[in-house]
UniProtKB/Swiss-Prot annotation:
It is found in: Cytoplasm. The gene is cpfC2. The lineage of its organism: Bacteria, Bacillati, Bacillota, Bacilli, Bacillales. It catalyses: Fe-coproporphyrin III + 2 H(+) = coproporphyrin III + Fe(2+). This is Coproporphyrin III ferrochelatase 2. PROSITE patterns: FERROCHELATASE (PS00534). Keywords: Cytoplasm, Heme biosynthesis, Iron, Lyase, Metal-binding, Porphyrin biosynthesis.
């Protein structure tokens, strides 16, 4: 029996693969407006501080291909083909959709490598893919909109936190800060669920890890005139120290799924500068990256969508 072909569109933010690519990447983020020399040098300096370039590009590719392999092992009746689509670097989301069209893919499942839904993130990615696919007569795209409460995602972070706490002597003097990328405050007034979803993720992980001292914070805010969601994790660290005298800070950037600039610089450098100033200890559990536990998590999420599509098709065919 011939296997049914299904596209697996894995979308992510993207990152420059060399320092020479930083300007084009930054310009794309700024909707075609080149950054000032000062802003460009600042960003390049951050990349240099983490070793020259972010590991994100390599990790994202590994996540996408391992997920595809896992799906092909789970569903022997389907043949999944991986298409990587990035927001700000090649291969762009549009490149992936056009390639699926050329390859004759008629049905696709899309997943964004970000757990929390926002109009700025997951919706924007899926809208770009679906809009172009409709324009060119490409595949029908079934989108996964969010997975912030996926049990295997929660258990991954709970296990990491439990492991981290084995390194801490005075656990009563430790606090966990769950964080995600800050976004403009205006999304809250518009009813965006992003903030509440992060809170829910934090509550679920805290319960699973059996921790009492935890809170949420925001990081990596953009440099724009509009106010962004706070508190920033660095300010939050200082406030928590002053109010509670915590001696150990465990940073869990659960809004991200891989090591990249925002984690390796904004957390591992900037937050550690703050904890060092406070004479407190800095901890940051391992990011999911392409670890088998996280790939299993992603495969579970996509598998649920496959079964949802199959059930929907059965209902339609029986009517």
């Amino acid at each position: 029996m011939k296997k049914k072909k299904i596209g697996l569109l894995v979308m992510a933010y993207g990152t420059p693969e060399s320092l020479d690519d930083v300007e084009a990447y930054y310009t794309h983020i700024r909707h075609g407006r080149k950054p000032s020399e000062e802003a460009l040098e600042d960003l390049i300096g951050r990349y240099k501080a983490i070793g020259g370039i972010s590991p994100l590009a390599k990790i994202t590719k590994e996540q996408a291909h391992k997920l595809t392999d896992s799906m092909n092992n789970i569903f022997t009746e389907y043949e999944f083909t991986c298409y990587l689509g990035l927001k700000h670097t090649a291969p762009f989301i549009e490149d992936a959709v056009e390639e699926m069209k050329r390859n004759g893919i008629e049905q696709t499942i899309s997943i964004v490598l970000a757990p929390h839904y926002s109009t700025f993130s997951i919706k924007a990615y899926n809208d770009r893919a679906i809009r172009l696919s409709k324009e060119i007569g490409g595949p029908v795209i079934e989108s996964i909109e969010q997975w912030y409460d996926e049990p295997k995602f929660i258990s991954y972070w709970a296990d990491q936190i439990k492991e981290t706490f084995t390194e801490i002597d005075d656990k009563e003097k430790a606090v966990v800060i769950f964080s995600a990328h800050s976004l403009p405050e205006k999304i809250i007034a518009a009813g965006d669920p992003y903030v509440e979803q992060l809170k829910h993720t934090a509550d679920l992980i805290a319960e699973a890890a059996n921790i009492q001292n935890y809170t949420i914070g925001w990081q990596s805010a953009g440099n724009t005139p509009d106010p962004w969601i706070g508190p920033d994790v660095q300010d939050l660290t200082k406030d928590l120290y002053e109010e509670h005298g915590y001696e150990s800070f465990i940073y869990c950037p659960v809004g991200f799924v891989a090591e990249h600039l925002e984690v390796l610089y904004d957390n591992d450098y900037e937050c550690k500068v703050v904890t060092d100033e406070l004479n407190a200890k800095y901890f940051r559990p391992n990011m999911p990256n392409a670890q088998s536990a996280f790939i299993d998590c992603l495969a579970e999420i996509v598998s649920k969508k496959v079964k949802e599509i199959v059930d929907k098709d059965l209902v339609l065919n029986n009517n």
